[in-house]
Amino acid sequence: MSLGLVGRKVGMTRVFTDDGDSIPVTVLEVGGNRVTQIKTDETDGYTAVQVTFGTRRASRVTKPLAGHLAKAGVEAGEIIVEFRIDATKAAELKLGDTIDVDLFSVDQKIDVQGTTIGKGYAGTIKRYHFSSGRASHGNSRSHNVPGSIGMAQDPGRVFPGKRMTGHMGDVTRTVQNLVIVRIDAERKLLLVKGAVPGAKSGFVVVSPAVKAKPQVAAAA
């Protein structure tokens, strides 16, 4: 895994190209990541860097976490995220370093992870796009029910994983291969083409795309 940034989803807007085309973008505030811990193979069994984002009052920080941050000399943040990196990259970092938006570049493809908006308890039609039953013609009380969920006498049970009603949303999702349209270094903002999981002010983790296809140069 490559080094990335953790931040917050600001919202959506649009930007215009020089040709006048409108591009929908999501604004991400991702600057000011502080290094709180550097893990190595010798001490932890793997190599990674731990960063924090945002600010938190000292009264809202647990004593174990306060000691952990004091050791790094870092101000308490709202969230802590870990990125797996190689030993060469880890050697370039030290406790207290700040990682900003200059980690990325315009037109770079990234993966963005966030927590989807919770929808509460939902039925199978909303949750899994099941078809509803007939409105009439013999159907009186089965308009929005999922239908049969079982099998015959053998196996005589409902298989695990059967799509049924339940809590919808509020799960971690990753959108891959989003393109960075603009970078506002002064305000530490990334403008990413397309939608990103989660509500406004929700935390997001931004990292270089793992499935990005190499750009092929156009033939002369």
UniProtKB/Swiss-Prot annotation:
InterPro entries: Ribosomal_uL3, Ribosomal_uL3_bac/org-type, Ribosomal_uL3_CS, Transl_B-barrel_sf. GO terms for molecular function: rRNA binding; structural constituent of ribosome. Residues 132-153 are annotated as: Disordered. Belongs to the universal ribosomal protein uL3 family. One of the primary rRNA binding proteins, it binds directly near the 3'-end of the 23S rRNA, where it nucleates assembly of the 50S subunit. It holds the Pfam family Ribosomal_L3. The modification N5-methylglutamine is found at residue 153. It comes from Ralstonia nicotianae (strain ATCC BAA-1114 / GMI1000). This is Large ribosomal subunit protein uL3. One of its GO terms (cellular component) is cytosolic large ribosomal subunit. Keywords: Methylation, Ribonucleoprotein, Ribosomal protein, RNA-binding, rRNA-binding. Part of the 50S ribosomal subunit. Forms a cluster with proteins L14 and L19. Methylated by PrmB. GO terms for biological process: translation. Gene3D superfamilies: 3.30.160.810, Translation factors. HAMAP family: Ribosomal_uL3_B (MF_01325_B).
